[in-house]
Structures are given as C-alpha cells and as structure tokens.
C-alpha cells in the first residue's frame, strides 16, 4: 500500500 494509505481514507491527512 502507498504511504498514508488506510482502510478509512485513501490519504491520511
């Protein structure tokens, strides 16, 4: 999975 990927959001910001 790419950096910042979570099951909740495509990008963790």
UniProtKB/Swiss-Prot annotation:
Which UniProt keyword terms apply here? Amphibian defense peptide, G-protein coupled receptor impairing toxin, Secreted, Toxin, Vasoactive, Vasodilator
Q: What does this protein do?
A: Produces in vitro relaxation of rat arterial smooth muscle and constriction of intestinal smooth muscle. May target bradykinin receptors (BDKRB).
Family membership noted in the UniProt record: Belongs to the bradykinin-related peptide family.
Primary site of residence: secreted
**Taxonomy, superkingdom:** Eukaryota
GO CC term, one of those recorded: extracellular region
MF (Gene Ontology): hormone activity; toxin activity
Task: Please give a single GO biological process term from the UniProt record.
Answer: vasodilation
Lineage of producing organism: Eukaryota, Metazoa, Chordata, Craniata, Vertebrata
Q: In which tissues is it expressed?
A: Expressed by the skin glands.
Q: Could you tell me what this protein is called? A: [Ala1,Thr6]-bradykinyl-Ser,Lys,Ala,Val
Localization, per the record, is: Secreted
Q: Does the keyword Oxidoreductase apply?
A: no
Which species? Physalaemus signifer
